[in-house]
Amino acid sequence: MDGAARRGVLAALLACGLLLLGAAATPTPPPAGSSPQDTCTSCGFRRPEEPGKVDGDFLEAVKRHILSRLQMRDRPNITHAVPKAAMVTALRKLHAGKVREDGRVEIPSLDGQASAGPPAHDPVSEIISFAETDDLASSRVRLYFFISNEGNQNLFVVQASLWLYLKLLPYVLEKGSRRKVRVKVYFQDPDTSNKWNVVEKKVDLKRSGWHTFPMTEAIQALFERGERRLNLDVQCEGCEEYSVLPIYVDPGEESHRPFLVVQARLADNKHRIRKRGLECDGRTNLCCRQQFYIDFRLIGWNDWIIAPSGYYGNYCEGSCPAYLAGVPGSASSFHTAVVNQYRMRGLNPGTVNSCCIPTKLSTMSMLYFDDEYNIVKRDVPNMIVEECGCA
């Protein structure tokens, strides 16, 4: 590599670093016969001579970006699905959405676009974990849950609850009397035989139904120890006497399988920089936002992403004249993190222009399976480009 080529590469790396730090690049007039999109590695969406090949690269970049934002190395290997009845029941009970006649889960706020209203400053992840069991006794059962650790992040548990279904069997009661039982939930230390009471609750039963038991402190303690498996001993005093059947892990009662719901909050928050931008409509060549929709079914990801059904991987394109330069932008975006990576391969980095980059990003809510078949609802920040500007 000669000196000129080496200087060109170093200039490109320096320019890329400035963009990722959100710094404003000094505008440089483009060479004759070229457009700003030809000379800036982060400006525009350059239509190449082989659109099919680049479309494939683009989709692979989208996949890598989504996995990165979910803090996953690879997509989950879904070899056996969580029983549909159990999943549907959990989602319905949590009012997370509804199930259509074709079996698809429909959640109004998970349509692949940003939700209305101000962005959440404290994104909350919701994890639904279904119970497994080691022992099937009539009045005492040991349940265990594998809980996603959300990419080994430090999580603060906002709320956690165990959902347990109590079924009433035929029983003759005196007039005016009710079935009253006491449910005790114990945390079992996996390394010792020690256990301690997590929650104790009196339940006054009129009919079969779901009951919740607070588990916030137990889950927080589990996360602080860096563990993922939660072992619980469940006892029901009075259940045999009053013909009350707690439903645990029964193949004939999959819709009533116990589940654990954990709402956890990430500590780090970042402020977003906002600026009103243009929409690309084919009538302007200035910096604007171009919408781009990816259907998860077409890329084979609908088996592990429950909702939304697709992703608006919007990007920024267009020219940035000198009078538009200097507008601050954000580098933590789909545009700079994904599109630049594969676009740089065919461009000459010898010159750097003011570039069209995202200036407003929004949160995307996702409902998906992790590697342990937990259902995770997560609000992922900085996923969708809302507005673009020059920097």
Swiss-Prot record:
GO terms for molecular function: cytokine activity; growth factor activity; hormone activity; protein homodimerization activity. Disulfide bonds join 280-288, 287-356, 316-388, 320-390. Residues 26-276 form a propeptide. One of its GO terms (cellular component) is perinuclear region of cytoplasm. It is found in: Secreted. Keywords: Cleavage on pair of basic residues, Disulfide bond, Glycoprotein, Growth factor, Hormone, Secreted, Signal. Residues 27-47 are annotated as: Disordered. Glycans are attached at residue 77. Residues 1-25 form the signal peptide. It comes from the Eukaryota. PROSITE patterns: TGF_BETA_1, TGF_BETA_2. It holds the Pfam family TGF_beta. Dimeric, linked by one or more disulfide bonds. Inhibin A is a dimer of alpha and beta-A. Inhibin B is a dimer of alpha and beta-B. Activin A is a homodimer of beta-A. Activin B is a homodimer of beta-B. Activin AB is a dimer of beta-A and beta-B. Inhibins and activins inhibit and activate, respectively, the secretion of follitropin by the pituitary gland. Inhibins/activins are involved in regulating a number of diverse functions such as hypothalamic and pituitary hormone secretion, gonadal hormone secretion, germ cell development and maturation, erythroid differentiation, insulin secretion, nerve cell survival, embryonic axial development or bone growth, depending on their subunit composition. Inhibins appear to oppose the functions of activins. This is Inhibin beta B chain. It comes from Gallus gallus (Chicken).
